[in-house]
Design a protein with these regions (language model features):
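Primarily recognizes Gram-negative and organellar outer-membrane beta-barrels
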Residues: 3-4, 8, 26-79, 93-749
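Eukaryotic intrinsically disordered and solvent-exposed regulatory patches
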Residues: 82
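Low-complexity, highly charged intrinsically disordered N-terminal segments
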Residues: 14-15
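Phosphoinositide-dependent membrane-docking surfaces
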Residues: 18-25
């Protein structure tokens, strides 16, 4: 919602000269919750004192944009356009808002600031249409009953287009000295979605708090993909293929949540929660594969259906040991039960009169999963201004899968859960330290030994022998104010260690190979990517931040330096290999408010990524970015200007020696019209025509370079108009020119 859930938005309905005092704080919605659940959910409250008492207000924003591409090579969205209207009504207890917007300038919101934003519009061509309606009603009575009802509906239609090209340069191996895998991917999709949400909450000091929430979504999506694959070994072409995908997907999702909070005594409270989540869908895919010749062509039609239902329940009991120092203990029990099925059939229609079943893409299975968790939590203050939370429990997950074509699967995973945290807060310093043990059971995709040949040269399969994995995470955060000049220094350290981490295991076949365990023949020069548990993964990330105000130029300067290290093991065939990645960085950020109407932001980032694996093959990339933003809110009373410049330089010292320079300049110039309630502006993106979307990264045994087509070079002429009315006990005009209605008051003010 524009208002209600976001209390800061309420200030948009008030004149700045009308506001006397603003007090912001967080409070518990239920007064008994305040007494019993000190760690419950809080809601932000704004108490605003005004000269006049606001009764209600309504406002509307009208937006219109028209423009064109500035790149003659870009055949998508040559005519750029946008049209939208936002209306909202605001009062103390009733809120109503509606939005309608259509554009192909890659904007997801019709907020005027977002539409006129000079930020990068992105490399994807996107055409969006959406409409939504939202309302909120609140009430309270003298007997202590208060509640809220919210309703929201939105319709969206999106069209996206992306074009990418990627190269994977492999390090020398047992089967080759040089290997290149190249993909050219063109993707277009159409997404139509309906989303609605209803929520109701009612609180009473005697009977507790009841909440209900319903969420319904319906999606109807279509996408088309064209994929060209090229393989090369020892500088000779080994294979190539061209694949076309047409996909139609329909999905329906509904979720119901119910919760109840109350107390037994002044020290004992409880919470009951329950939810059901139903998801079902239909999918129909058409796939044409052309490998090295027409004799290997396949024409697959693949219809599928799925349904999944999930029930969740949670019960919590809290006992206040000492109300004076907020010491409490809680007992939690949660259960999740999931059952579902998926049926998929595939036929090769290359010969329509004699269709053949495609075994690799035909399967049917059912799943039944049960997860239970018991946990005890203790909250206390061991020292002054220092709180401590300790929790420990046990989690049990039972996974079941029934499938005719392969062995059924049933396994139970039992693991502990542990969390310890300390938080210290003071006026000039604060710190926190935490340890948490996470556990992850493998999912159905990782466990099913079923071949996925969506890409015939990058085959994928699960592993039914996977173990559950554990993640030990450590966090330390410290902030301290230095001296009398409000300088602050902060330290952030994160570290994690993984046990039984599921990683990719890549096996390469230089000749056509039959895989008996998967009942599939892998084509020559293809790879099979499966999962395997591995030990030895760990990483550490650290950052030192210094902030200092520069009062002479009304500025704030931030300097931060960081270092990241990752120790990442994986498998190449049966050989365990490890990649070590070092990533030091240095950042500068300067925010200047030179005058009330002039703001300047300058930033720079330098970092170097050095990766090396067990075979001493390396990837080395240097990055340097710099940016500047200039915002002049008023020029000659009616005009304004915003500009954003961004420079990106990267150089690869590895296999391809790629050098990338990227200069992006976006500009927006406008003027106020119609008594300052309207805006006319011109926005232009990538004026220098030097934007390149390139990325290079080292993976297990290869370095991948990716180029993405850029659709963000265009200009628009924009018109925005604001209008509305405010009703209050004050006669006059607001600072945006809208007229206040006068309502006489009885008695003295």
């Amino acid at each position: 919602l524009i208002f209600g859930s976001d209390p800061m938005a309420a200030l948009k309905n008030l004149s700045a000269t009308d506001v006397l005092k603003i007090k912001a704080y967080d409070e518990y919605e239920n007064t008994k919750t305040k007494k019993l659940m000190y760690r419950g959910d809080l809601t932000r409250v704004l108490n605003i004192e005004t000269k006049s008492k606001l009764i209600s207000s309504w406002k509307a924003h009208l937006l219109a944009s028209t423009g064109s591409n500035m790149d003659s090579k870009n055949d998508r969205g040559k005519f750029r356009k946008g049209l939208g209207l936002t209306t909202n009504f605001f009062s103390e207890k009733f809120l109503l808002t509606s939005n309608v917007f259509h554009n192909n300038i890659n904007r997801k919101s019709n907020n005027i600031k977002n539409v006129l934003s000079i930020s990068d519009p992105g490399s994807t061509y996107n055409e969006t249409t959406y409409a939504d309606l939202a309302t909120e009603r609140s009430w309270d009575t003298e007997n202590g009953t208060y509640g809220t009802f919210r309703a929201f509906y939105t319709f969206g239609y999106n069209r996206d287009n992306t074009n990418t090209r990627s190269e994977q340069h492999y390090f020398p191996g047992n089967n080759y000295q040089q290997r290149l895998y190249e993909e050219q991917n063109s993707n277009s999709d159409r997404k139509q979605n309906h989303y609605s949400e209803f929520s109701f909450s009612n609180s009473n000091d005697k009977w507790g708090e009841f909440r209900w929430n319903q969420l319904i979504t319906y999606n109807n999506n279509k996408d088309w993909q064209s994929l060209y694959i090229y393989n090369e070994e020892n500088n000779l072409q080994t294979s190539k293929s061209l694949m076309h995908y047409d996909n139609l997907n329909k999905n329906f999702h509904v979720k119901e949540d119910v919760s109840y909070v109350n107390s037994i005594t002044d020290r004992i409270g409880y919470t009951l929660e329950s939810s059901v989540d139903i998801n079902k869908g239909k999918n129909h895919s058409l796939r044409i594969d052309t490998l090295e010749s027409s004799t290997t062509q396949t024409y697959l039609t693949i219809p599928s259906k799925l349904r999944n239902t999930e029930w969740n329940g949670n019960a919590q009991l809290i006992y206040i040991l000492n109300p004076e120092n907020d010491t409490q203990i809680s007992f939690d029990y949660s259960v999740k039960y999931e059952n579902g099925w998926k049926h998929q059939f595939a036929w090769n229609m290359l010969s329509p009169t004699n269709p053949q079943t495609d075994e690799a893409n035909t399967y049917s299975y059912k799943i039944n999963n049960l997860t239970q968790k018991q946990e005890v939590s203790f909250h206390f203050f061991p020292f002054q201004k220092t709180s401590c939370d300790i929790s420990a429990g046990l989690k049990e997950s039972t996974l079941k899968r029934k499938e005719k074509e392969m062995d059924n699967y049933r396994k139970t995973f039992i693991s502990p859960t542990v969390a310890i945290s300390f938080v210290h807060t003071d006026i000039t310093k604060s710190w926190s330290a935490a340890y948490r043990l996470h556990n992850f059971a493998p999912n159905i995709v990782q466990l099913r030994p079923q071949i996925d040949n969506s890409n015939p040269y990058m085959l994928r399969s699960g592993n039914p022998n996977l173990k559950q994995s554990y993640l030990h995470s450590f966090l330390f955060n410290c902030n301290r104010m230095l001296g009398k000049h409000n300088h602050t220094i902060g330290v952030i350290i994160n570290a994690s260690i993984r046990q039984h981490s599921p990683v990719a295991k890549t096996t390469y076949y230089n000749a056509e190979t039959y895989l008996p365990e998967l009942q599939y023949t892998a084509p020559a020069h293809s790879s099979l990517i499966s999962f395997e548990n591995v030990e030895g993964y760990w990483d550490i990330k650290g950052k030192l931040i210094w902030q200092a105000p520069i009062r002479s130029i009304k500025s704030k300067y931030t300097l931060s330096t960081g270092f990241n290290y990752e120790h990442n093991p994986y498998y190449i065939g049966e050989n365990k290999t490890t990649t070590r990645t070092y990533d030091p960085s240095l950042e500068h950020f300067l925010l200047c408010s030179l005058t009330k109407r002039l703001k300047v932001t300058i930033s720079a980032n330098t970092h170097y990524v050095h990766s090396i694996n067990t075979e001493n093959y390396t990837g080395k990339t240097f990055y340097q970015t710099a940016g500047a933003m200039l915002d002049i809110s008023q020029i000659c009373k009616y005009f304004y200007l915003s500009s954003h410049y961004n420079f990106i330089f990267s150089r690869d010292y590895g296999i391809n020696k790629e050098i990338n320079r990227n200069h992006t300049l976006n500009l927006n110039v406008g003027c106020k019209v119609l008594n300052r309630k309207g805006d006319i502006s011109i926005a232009a993106y990538d004026l220098l025509n030097s934007h390149r979307t390139f990325n290079s990264q080292m993976y297990s045994n290869y370095i991948q370079n990716t180029w993405t087509n850029y659709y963000g070079r265009f200009f628009t002429i924009n018109f925005a108009y604001r209008f509305g009315k405010v009703k209050s006990n004050y006669e006059g005009t607001t600072n945006d020119g809208s007229i206040r209605e006068y309502r006489p008051m009885s008695g003295k003010i």
